[in-house]
Amino acid sequence: MCDGDCRPLGFLLGLPFAFLSLLLSIIGVIIWIVGLLLSCICPCCLCVTVLVEIAIGLIKAPIHVMEWFMSKIPC
């Protein structure tokens, strides 16, 4: 059916969701910076490591949302 991964309609429809994900990733960056500072102060806290991992997931959210949304749109 489709010979390529070019789905401009899916890209355009996914832009509002990507914008919301971008806001989440900005929050993730803030959490990541705070988590890194806390882990430098007290490296024995395991919960800070989990917090940093969640923040990294939030930072990658816009890319995952756009890929997911574009994969749902047929050619």
Swiss-Prot record:
One GO cellular component term: plasma membrane
Keywords: Developmental protein, Secreted, Signal, Stress response
Subcellular compartments: Secreted
Tissue expression remark: Expressed in shoot apical meristems (SAM); mostly specific to the L1 layer in the center of the meristem but also detected in the L2 layer in organ primordia. Also observed in the vasculature of seedling roots.
Biological process per Gene Ontology, one example term: organ boundary specification between lateral organs and the meristem
InterPro entries per record: TAXIMIN_1/2
The keyword Magnesium is assigned to this record: no
Function: Signaling peptide involved in the regulation of lateral organs separation, including fruits and leaves. Involved in the perception of and response to light stress via the control of sinapoyl-malate accumulation, a UV-B protecting compound.
Protein name (record): Signaling peptide TAXIMIN 1
Organism: Arabidopsis thaliana
Lineage: Eukaryota, Viridiplantae, Streptophyta, Embryophyta, Tracheophyta
Gene name for this UniProt entry: TAX1
